[in-house]
């Protein structure tokens, strides 16, 4: 068994590597994720309608109904006419990129801690690189790539965008696995 204390360096470095890789994918390679989102052609009108409804931060569904209303002809009409979707609203104000980046780095650390915890229980010191790589890579891939797939299934995120997120997750998993394999205790 390998302890978390023995894996502090791969935990930290893999988090840093993933953080920088994600920065490249999202901020430098503008062709990769920039086309994933688009605005409304009548953004001012949509924004005014949302403000008029006094909607605070949260998740909103359109059309919204309770389960017992699903069979109601008026509700079914709303679904047929559209739009049908989910809208996420944040608090009004300037985007705080620093807070988002801090939360993302904390998530990267958390993933690496769980990868270390799992691999530390199933692998011994001196385990060959490829065995560490496979174990940690599988765990990291499940964390970074698979957790977001239900967004496309249930919330309508475009599959093209979702596949890109899975590819991102694969890159992050490979970086995490490589770091752990490289720095695995003898």
Positions of the model-derived regions?
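Juxtamembrane/disordered regions of integral membrane proteins
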Residues: 1-186
């Amino acid at each position: 068994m390998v302890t978390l204390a023995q894996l502090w360096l791969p935990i930290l470095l893999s988090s840093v590597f993933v953080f920088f890789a994600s920065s490249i994918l999202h901020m430098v390679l503008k062709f990769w994720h920039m086309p994933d989102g688009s605005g409304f052609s009548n953004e001012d009108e949509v924004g005014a309608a949302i403000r008029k409804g006094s909607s605070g931060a949260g998740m909103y569904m359109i059309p919204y109904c309770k389960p017992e209303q699903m069979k109601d002809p008026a509700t079914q009409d709303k679904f047929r006419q559209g739009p049908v979707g989910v809208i996420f609203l944040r608090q009004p104000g300037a985007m705080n990129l620093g807070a988002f980046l801090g939360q993302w780095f904390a998530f990267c650390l958390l993933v690496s801690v769980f990868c270390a915890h799992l691999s530390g229980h199933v692998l011994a010191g001196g385990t060959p690189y490829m065995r560490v790589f496979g174990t940690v890579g599988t765990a990291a891939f499940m964390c970074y790539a698979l957790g977001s797939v239900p967004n496309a299934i249930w919330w309508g995120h475009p599959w093209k965008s979702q596949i890109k997120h899975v590819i991102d997750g694969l890159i992050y998993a490979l970086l995490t696995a490589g770091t752990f394999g490289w720095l695995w205790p003898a």
